[in-house]
Design a protein with these regions (language model features):
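N-terminal intrinsically disordered, low-complexity, charge/repeat-rich segments that act as generic
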Residues: 1-14
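Short glycine/threonine/proline-enriched tight-turn/helix- or strand-capping micro-motif at secondary-structure
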Residues: 22-26
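Short, conserved turn/kink motifs that form compact alpha/beta structural patches or helix kinks used as
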Residues: 27-124
Length: 124
């Protein structure tokens, strides 16, 4: 296993949590709120099996990823991670979204946290 260095953390990653908000018409809508932003490394790995799956009758991509960040105790499985990859023609951010599947401290040293994720698409 390659030793991790702080310089390997070159992606800005924002952790979000799903919540419900009420709009002006008193309807409840699900949305995500930003919790914190950290530096991290995003790596793909193909050893997790078939990356294609059938979604609503069409082929979609569910790409497994490993995200490494500095150790934190406040990560939860019901969060998601987003990474800005650019902007669209309106100037709005284009985001890659990752659902958290599992996480662990690989060396039990409280230095690094490896998060197994599933990429779920652009702009969540």
């Amino acid at each position: 296993m390659k030793k991790k260095r702080t310089s390997d953390l070159r992606h800005r990653l924002t952790f979000q949590k799903k919540t419900e908000i009420q709009d002006e018409e008193l309807n409840w809508n699900q949305t995500y709120i930003d919790l914190f932003t950290v530096w991290g490394a995003v790596e793909g790995f193909s050893s997790l099996g078939n990356n294609e799956s059938m979604i609503a009758g069409a082929w979609g991509v569910k790409s497994p990823k490993k995200i490494t960040i500095r150790f934190r105790q406040d990560i939860q499985r019901d969060m998601r991670i987003v990474k800005q990859v650019g902007t669209n023609e309106k100037g709005e951010p284009v985001l890659r979204a990752f659902d958290i599947l599992d996480f662990n401290d690989p060396e039990d040293s409280r230095v690094w946290l490896e998060i197994m994720c599933q990429e779920v698409g652009l702009n969540g």
